[in-house]
């Protein structure tokens, strides 16, 4: 069952779901709550790596990822990050999200931004039960013009769904949770897959 606006507000008030800083109740509508863009970004560097072998030796994959991904880029609140057509970048939400073991979250982009070519998640829009941390956004500009993205702008909307029970292995309790408590735009940790 998806939570409606009044239940989202109640779950936030009761601390069952936590968003920090908490968006105002005016950001709750129908079945979602708006989230804003944070200050942490990462991009692909100019590189000569011909490809990343996603099933190759871990050490080689780690070295390839380190060669192609930038260090964290911090954008001040009064500055803009420019995403050019055909580019992929990582960023975070301003809000840190904490979910209990019986609720899954879903991140959706905003229609107004999608109509300009901005995808806020390439495929990964599920927020696992037991998640705690900022949400990493996988931006892609499918449009024809560069887009100026500014910290604190409304970037997406979260909805929440109650599971049939409590997950036995919620995300942050798992030893193999690769993005546990993330607070910045962490790049792919596919090299940590078992």
Curated annotation (Swiss-Prot):
Keywords: Hydrolase, Nucleotide metabolism, Nucleotide-binding
E.C. code: 3.5.4.13
Keyword Hydrolase: yes
Gene that produces this protein: dcd
GO BP: dUMP biosynthetic process; dUTP biosynthetic process; nucleobase-containing small molecule interconversion
Complex and partners: Homotrimer.
Origin species: Glaesserella parasuis serovar 5 (strain SH0165)
GO MF, one annotated term: nucleotide binding
Name by which UniProt lists this protein: dCTP deaminase
Catalytic activity: dCTP + H2O + H(+) = dUTP + NH4(+)
Pfam families attached to this UniProt entry: DCD
Pathway in which the depicted protein is active: Pyrimidine metabolism; dUMP biosynthesis; dUMP from dCTP (dUTP route): step 1/2
